[in-house]
Structures are given as C-alpha cells and as structure tokens.
Amino acid sequence: MMTVTDLLHAEELPGLTLLTHETNLDAPILQANILENPDAFDWLTPGEILLTTGYIFKDQPCLQKRLIQELANMNCAALGFKVQRYFNEVPQEMIQLANDVGLPILSIPYNYNFSQIISLVNRRVNQPDETISQHSVHMHVSYTHLRAHE
C-alpha cells in the first residue's frame, strides 16, 4: 500500500511539496490518473491521486472550486498540481477549500513528467506485500514439514 505521505517522501521524486494542511496524508493511493478533461468527474474513483497542469480550469474559478469539492466527495487521495505551466502557483482559493474539505494538494515541479509519478505509484501499489509473502512461505514450509512427518 502507498499513502500520500509515502509519495511525498519518495526518494525517486524529490521536490514534491504539500501545499495544504497535513490532513489525510495517511490516505491510501490506489492508482494515479491524469485530469485534463472537465468531463472526467464522471470517471473518478476513490483512492486516486489526480495529476493536472490546471489547463482545463485556467480561467475558471468556479470549475477550480468544483474540482476540489468533487475530488473530496469521491474520496480521492490527493490532487497533484504541476506548477509553472499554466499556473505559477496553485490558486489560494483552491488551497483554502482543499484545507476545508481535507484534500491534500501536492505541488509537482515543472520538470517532472506525469508518467514518472504514475509509474512510481503503479510499482508501489502493485508490488507484493512482503509480510503476506513471508507469511505464505512460512505456512508452506510448515505444511510441508507436517506432511513429511505423517
């Protein structure tokens, strides 16, 4: 399992910055997705981190607020916002609303590709849980040992 805190501290992605209060940082990230389409609200799923440049809501404060509210309502893990592309910084209104609803917003440095973040999330989410793997091996060895002594 990967959490928002894990992503913020990932050695592979130095420079990710938390812009909101330290709320819901233990939220599990189940997948990463790119949000560059205003119709995408219909396809959001809980546990996603949504990555955006902000292009779809550049000059639309109402859509910026709707985005934060929709992500919070869907229990999305976080919003990753790539700055220095269409926005020099994340609008304060978005940060304030995200604080109010408990949605973490991460600032993504301009030089990062979204694929770097998606790849890391996919690797971490899909890697086998070491504890479960070790327990399975232990059970198999115990079972084999019992069968050998029957």
Predicted regions and their residues:
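Alpha-helical/coil-rich non-catalytic "connector" segments in signaling and regulatory proteins
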Residues: M1-R147
